[in-house]
């Protein structure tokens, strides 16, 4: 059986490492996310499997806090006449008292990256390129593991993607991925795994199998969502009530019918939220667009049908895009 790939997610404090892992794992409960720095204090792991076969192990690591001081310390570890390479220097550091005291969090990160097949270096693309980030990359490079930079938070207007691209290239890191964990692109995960496969050729079969399975799951979710909406429309269209002709009875029956439709719609909304791994608190549904209980247009008018057809087509396209985006975000 093929061994699962081990992937460490590393980076500065508060750059979205845990949020990225939640996206890749489709598990909103993984880890702890907060605006406070250094939220993650220990290494946490999770495994992605397909048909019971483990394919990828992902490890969330604490944020790097003082890479500048750590790099200075590492550069003083060589004894007279020694020229240690990166991994040997880190082994000596991890055996030192400083790794258990002053640089305890950094030591956890380096141990995990050295025990992994590769690392994802998560970057908050809204931040300027500072010396501390260059020193972080210099320290991580000593592990001797492939490192793929991931530009996070690239959807906003304040992102600095191009300066980061240039800075990474100057450090010899020419492959990178733009992957916003809040609003991930539709092809974000396949591109991330494809880029990883270029750095880690032996892991290509596992990564491709993950991509194929996720695409199959996305199609199944889409079909299940379409069925839920179709069942809602059929149930509402088939809803009939016989009432007396008195005005009071008609008003009461109309209100009761509206309430039944709202309840049926709400059940559909809740089922869709569960399908895409949202909770009820994540979305607020408005009432159906009715005017005095009736559609404003004659549904059988050819012009109305034409307009509805255009709107429906646009809505389906928008819904498909939104559905895929949600799928990438939370499952």
Kindly give the residue locations of the regions a language model identified.
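Conserved nucleotide-binding/hydrolysis micro-motifs of P-loop NTPases
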Residues: 39, 63-65, 126-128, 154-158, ...
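Membrane-proximal, non-transmembrane alpha-helical segments
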Residues: 252-311
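Canonical P-loop GTPase G-domain recognition
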Residues: 153-223
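Alpha-helical transmembrane helix bundles of large polytopic membrane transport and channel proteins
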Residues: 203-259
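Internal hydrophobic scaffold segments of catalytic domains
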Residues: 37-74, 191-195, 200-202, 251-273
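Membrane-inserting effector segments that mediate pore formation, membrane fusion
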Residues: 303-331
């Amino acid at each position: 059986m093929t061994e699962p790939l081990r992937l460490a997610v590393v980076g500065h404090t508060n750059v979205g490492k845990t949020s990225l892992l939640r996206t890749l794992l489709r598990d909103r409960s993984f880890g702890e996310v907060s605006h406070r720095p250094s939220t993650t204090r220990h290494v946490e792991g999770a495994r992605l499997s397909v048909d019971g076969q483990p394919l990828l192990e992902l490890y969330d690591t604490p944020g790097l806090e003082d890479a500048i001081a750590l790099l200075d310390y590492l550069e003083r570890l060589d004894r007279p006449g020694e020229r240690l390479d990166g991994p040997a220097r880190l082994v000596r550091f991890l055996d030192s008292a400083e790794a258990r005291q002053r640089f305890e969090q950094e030591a956890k990160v380096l141990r995990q990256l050295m025990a992994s097949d590769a690392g994802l270096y998560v970057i908050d693309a809204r931040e300027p390129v500072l010396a501390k980030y260059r020193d972080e990359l210099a320290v991580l490079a000593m592990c001797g593991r492939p490192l793929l930079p991931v530009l996070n938070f690239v959807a906003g207007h304040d992102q600095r993607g191009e300066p980061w691209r240039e800075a990474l290239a100057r450090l010899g890191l020419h492959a990178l991925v733009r992957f916003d964990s809040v609003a991930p692109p539709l092809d974000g995960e396949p591109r991330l795994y494809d880029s990883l496969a270029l750095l880690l050729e032996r892991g290509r079969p596992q990564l491709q199998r993950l991509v194929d399975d996720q695409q199959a799951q996305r199609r199944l979710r889409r079909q299940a969502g379409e069925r839920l909406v179709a069942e809602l429309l059929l149930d509402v269209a088939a809803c009939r009530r016989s009432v007396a002709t008195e005005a009071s009875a008609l008003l009461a029956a109309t209100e009761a019918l509206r309430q039944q439709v709202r309840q049926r719609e709400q059940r559909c909304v809740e089922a869709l939220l569960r399908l895409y791994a949202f909770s009820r608190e994540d979305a607020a549904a408005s009432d159906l667009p009715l005017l005095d209980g009736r559609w404003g247009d004659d549904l059988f008018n050819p012009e109305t049908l034409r307009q509805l057809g255009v709107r429906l087509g646009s809505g389906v396209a928008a819904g498909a895009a939104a559905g895929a985006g949600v799928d990438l975000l939370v499952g």
